[in-house]
Amino acid sequence: MKLTRRESKQRRHRRVRGKVQGSPERPRLAVFRSNEHIYAQVIDDTQHHTLVSASTVEPEVKSSLASGANCEASSQIGKLIAVRSLEKGITKVVFDRGGNLYHGRIKALAEAAREAGLDF
């Protein structure tokens, strides 16, 4: 029986999470993409603690965007998560794309975070 898109995404997500582990030296930059918004968190998996987060739901970000569901919004979140991470002294991360393909909004966020100074 053919897999649905949802099942394929869940399988990819489990596979990626099996390989990607955040540490205090290199925390995990986890990205979640919904139909309306995009969320990014820098997580230390050993402590189970979120160090930094940014999303298009935040009022200061939401007011400056026409939509939270496009590449422009994703790149703005990528820059914001990088700036907040660098303020906390985090320069190196491990990128966790979740079950999403590295394309479109996910790629825009990753490239913007790299340009803003995060190393991954």
UniProtKB/Swiss-Prot annotation:
Transmembrane segments: none annotated. Pfam families: Ribosomal_L18p. GO terms for cellular component: cytosolic large ribosomal subunit. It comes from the Bacteria. Gene3D superfamilies: 3.30.420.100. GO terms for molecular function: 5S rRNA binding; structural constituent of ribosome. The keyword RNA-binding applies. InterPro entries: Ribosomal_uL18_bac-type (IPR004389), Ribosomal_uL18_bac/euk (IPR005484). Residues 8-18 have a biased composition (Basic residues). Residues 1-26 are annotated as: Disordered. Keywords: Ribonucleoprotein, Ribosomal protein, RNA-binding, rRNA-binding. One of its GO terms (biological process) is translation. The keyword rRNA-binding applies. Part of the 50S ribosomal subunit; part of the 5S rRNA/L5/L18/L25 subcomplex. Contacts the 5S and 23S rRNAs. Belongs to the universal ribosomal protein uL18 family. This is one of the proteins that bind and probably mediate the attachment of the 5S RNA into the large ribosomal subunit, where it forms part of the central protuberance. HAMAP family: Ribosomal_uL18_B. This is Large ribosomal subunit protein uL18. It comes from Trichormus variabilis (strain ATCC 29413 / PCC 7937).
